Amino acid sequence: QEGKINYMPTNDELLEGFQNSRLVNKQTLGIIYMLESKIRDRARHSTALLGMSNYSLEHIMPKKWPNNWPACASEEDRIKRNRKLLTLGNLAIITSSLNSSIRDANWNDKRNGKGNKHGLRHFAAGLETLSDSYLNKDVWDESIIDERAVFLFNKAKDIWNL
């Protein structure tokens, strides 16, 4: 078709997108769900992946991070952190929305829960896109967000032979 452009991004462009593109929730949910559906180790899981509408999108570092997360050293660092909040490395699908008291909690409470409120570890159990290798991190910061973005990028590259 005349005027139709078929363009495949380079690996560098795709990695840039995984690390720095700020996406709307529906886009991110779809991308992470598709990755999960392709990398899921069916031999390890007794349950099937649920339909996409059964998952909630969670900001691992919350949008309201200043309330309970470590402060940034400078205004420039704060701006960089805020830019990372909506990137793929900081977003995850989970089986249920977190309770509001946990959603904006510090990293330890957010991942493990507090009292009778479950955290990410509970609601992400069995999901390869937010595995224990990330939930066991002592901190969740911009470097870990970038690390996870690279992990997701590499999975996408392997799946779609990019």
Features from the language model and the residues they span:
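Long, cytosolic, alpha-helical-rich C-terminal regions that act as interaction/scaffolding modules
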Residues: 83-87, 91-162
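Intrinsically disordered, low-complexity N-proximal targeting/linker segments that flank membranes
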Residues: 1-84, 88, 93
